C-alpha cells in the first residue's frame, strides 16, 4: 500500500528555478504577479525576478481633482497616491534583495494627469531603473497625461474640452512660447535617459525632453513621441537622427514639428498621427512594412516615401472631413499612394460618401477593416468592386442614424467578384440589428459563396432579441459548412 506522502500531488511549478517563475509572472498584470507572494514561502520573493513593471491610472481619473482635492484637502500632497504607492512598492521589493533580482526589462506607467508633486517620485523611479539596467535591454513607456491624441479637440485638466492650439510649427516663435505659458507644469526627463545604451524601446508622452548636448541611443529600435511640452521640431529631429538602429517610429500630436527626415535609416513601421502643422515628411520606405496615418487629407508634398515598392499594411484615419473638391482629390491621391497594400484598416467616420466615387483599385488587398458608421450599400459595393482579391472583411460598426427612405438594393447587385469567389471570412462587430445593419448582413452573406467563417459581435440586449438576430443572420447564408461565431 502506497504511503500518504507518495499519493500527495507534487507541485511541479514550484520546483522551477526563480528566474523562470519570474519570467512566467512577468506576463501577468503587475498587481496579480505581486499577489503570487501569498501562495507559499516558496513564492515569497519570486516577485524580485519579475522583469516587467506596469501601472496606470484610468483616463479621466484626475479630472475633478481641482474641485475635490486641491481646494478641500488639509494635507497638500499628490492625489495620485495609488499609482505612486504601487510603483514604489514594486521597486522597493526588488531593492530588498540587493543583487539577487533579475534586471528589469520593461518599465511602464501612465498618469491620467501628472502634477508637479509627483516629480520627485518619478525621478527616483527612473534613476533606479537606469542605474540597474546599464548592460541589459530596457523598454520604457512613460505617459504623463491620458487623453485624446488629436489636438483639435482635447480634454483639459478640468475635465472639459479646450479648442485647438495652433502653433507655428517652428522652434523660434516667441509669440508661440508666450501662448504656452499658461500650460500646466510638465515633467522634464532626466538627461541620463538619453545616454542609456540599454534602451531598446522609448515611448514618451506629454513631457519635456530637454535633450542634452549629446544623445547616445545606439540600440534604440522603437521610438514614440506624443505631444512633447516646449520641445521644438529641431529637438524631435535631433533625437530621431541620434538613433541609428531605429526601425519603428511614431510621431503623435507634435504641433511644433514642421518637417522631418528619416532618410538615413530604413524604417519598417511608421506612424504619423495628428501632427497638423507638419509640411513635409521624407522617409526611406524601401523596407517599410506598415504605415499608420491620422490627420487631414494630406497634400501631395506632405508624405514622400522614397524607394517604396508597396507597403503591405496601412491604417488610415482622417480626423477632419474633406470639405472641398480639392481636399477630396487629395484623399483619392493618398489612397492611390497606398493602393498596393495587402492589409488596409480605414477609419471612415469623417468621410462623406462623395469621397468614395473615385476610390482607387486595391488589386492586392486581402484583408480590409472598415471602422465607423456603417456605409450605405452603394458605397460598400463600390469598395468591394475595387478589391477583387479580398479574403477577409471586417466591419467595426459604430452607432449611426439610419438614412431616411433607405431603399434595399437588389441582392444580385452585390454579386461582386470578391464575394463570389474570394471572401472566406466576414466579421461584423457591434451588431445592434438596425435596418441598415440587417440589410448589409443579408446582402453580404447571401452573396458570399465561398465563405468559411463568420463572426458577429452583438451588442448587449435581451436574449430574445439576440436570438432572433442570430437566426436571421444564419438564414441569410448560402455557403455551406461555415464556422459560425456569435459573441
Predicted regions and their residues:
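Leucine-rich repeat
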Residues: 2-255, 261, ...
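Conserved hydrophobic position(s) of the canonical leucine-rich repeat
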Residues: 50, 104, 135-137, 199, ...
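C-terminal per-repeat helix/turn "cap" of leucine-rich repeat
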Residues: 192, 213-216, 236-239, 260, ...
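Acidic, glycine-rich loop-and-beta core segments that form the ion-binding/anion-interacting portion
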Residues: 270-338
Amino acid at each position: 500500500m502506497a504511503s500518504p506522502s507518495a499519493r500527495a500531488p507534487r507541485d511541479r511549478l514550484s520546483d522551477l528555478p526563480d528566474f523562470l517563475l519570474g519570467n512566467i509572472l512577468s506576463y501577468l498584470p503587475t498587481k496579480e504577479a505581486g499577489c503570487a507572494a501569498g501562495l507559499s514561502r516558496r513564492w515569497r520573493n519570486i516577485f524580485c525576478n519579475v522583469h516587467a513593471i506596469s501601472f496606470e491610472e484610468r483616463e479621466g481619473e484626475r479630472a475633478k481633482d481641482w474641485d475635490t482635492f486641491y481646494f478641500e484637502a488639509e494635507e497638500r500632497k499628490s492625489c495620485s497616491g495609488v499609482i505612486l504607492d504601487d510603483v514604489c512598492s514594486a521597486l522597493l521589493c526588488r531593492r530588498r534583495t540587493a543583487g539577487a533580482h533579475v534586471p528589469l526589462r520593461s518599465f511602464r506607467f501612465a498618469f491620467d494627469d501628472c502634477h508637479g508633486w509627483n516629480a520627485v517620485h518619478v525621478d527616483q523611479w527612473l534613476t533606479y531603473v537606469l542605474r540597474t539596467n546599464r548592460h541589459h535591454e530596457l523598454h520604457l513607456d512613460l505617459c504623463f497625461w491620458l487623453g485624446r491624441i488629436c489636438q483639435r479637440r482635447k480634454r483639459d485638466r478640468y475635465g472639459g474640452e479646450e479648442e485647438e492650439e495652433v502653433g507655428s510649427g517652428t522652434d523660434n516663435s516667441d509669440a508661440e512660447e508666450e501662448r504656452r505659458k499658461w500650460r500646466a507644469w510638465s515633467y522634464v526627463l532626466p538627461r541620463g535617459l538619453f545616454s542609456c545604451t540599454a534602451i531598446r524601446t522609448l515611448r514618451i508622452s506629454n513631457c519635456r525632453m530637454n535633450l542634452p548636448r549629446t544623445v547616445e541611443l545606439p540600440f534604440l529600435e522603437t521610438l514614440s513621441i506624443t505631444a512633447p511640452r516646449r520641445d521644438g521640431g529641431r529637438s524631435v529631429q535631433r533625437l530621431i537622427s541620434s538613433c541609428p538602429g531605429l526601425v519603428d517610429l511614431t510621431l503623435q500630436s507634435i504641433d511644433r514639428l514642421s518637417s522631418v527626415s528619416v532618410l538615413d535609416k530604413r524604417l519598417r513601421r511608421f506612424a504619423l498621427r495628428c501632427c497638423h502643422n507638419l509640411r513635409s515628411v521624407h522617409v526611406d520606405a524601401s523596407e517599410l512594412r506598415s504605415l499608420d496615418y491620422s490627420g487631414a487629407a494630406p497634400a501631395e508634398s506632405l508624405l514622400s516615401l522614397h524607394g517604396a515598392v508597396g507597403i503591405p499594411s496601412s491604417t488610415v484615419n482622417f480626423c477632419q472631413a474633406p470639405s472641398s473638391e480639392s481636399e477630396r482629390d487629395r484623399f483619392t491621391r493618398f489612397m492611390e499612394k497606398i493602393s498596393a497594400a495587402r492589409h488596409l484598416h480605414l477609419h471612415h467616420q469623417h468621410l462623406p460618401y462623395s469621397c468614395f466615387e473615385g476610390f482607387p483599385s486595391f488589386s492586392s488587398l486581402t484583408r480590409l477593416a472598415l471602422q465607423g458608421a456603417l456605409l450605405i450599400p452603394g458605397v460598400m459595393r463600390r469598395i468591394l468592386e475595387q478589391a477583387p482579391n479580398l479574403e477577409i472583411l471586417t466591419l467595426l460598426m459604430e452607432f449611426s442614424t439610419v438614412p431616411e427612405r433607405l431603399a434595399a438594393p437588389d441582392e444580385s447587385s452585390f454579386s461582386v467578384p470578391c464575394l463570389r469567389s474570394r471572401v472566406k471570412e466576414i466579421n461584423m462587430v457591434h451588431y445592434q440589428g438596425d435596418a441598415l445593419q440587417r440589410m448589409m448582413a443579408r446582402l453580404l452573406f447571401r452573396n458570399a459563396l465561398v465563405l468559411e467563417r463568420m463572426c458577429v459581435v452583438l451588442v448587449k440586449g435581451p436574449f430574445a432579441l439576440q436570438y432572433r438576430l442570430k437566426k436571421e443572420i444564419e438564414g441569410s447564408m448560402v455557403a455551406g459548412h461555415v464556422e459560425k461565431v456569435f459573441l
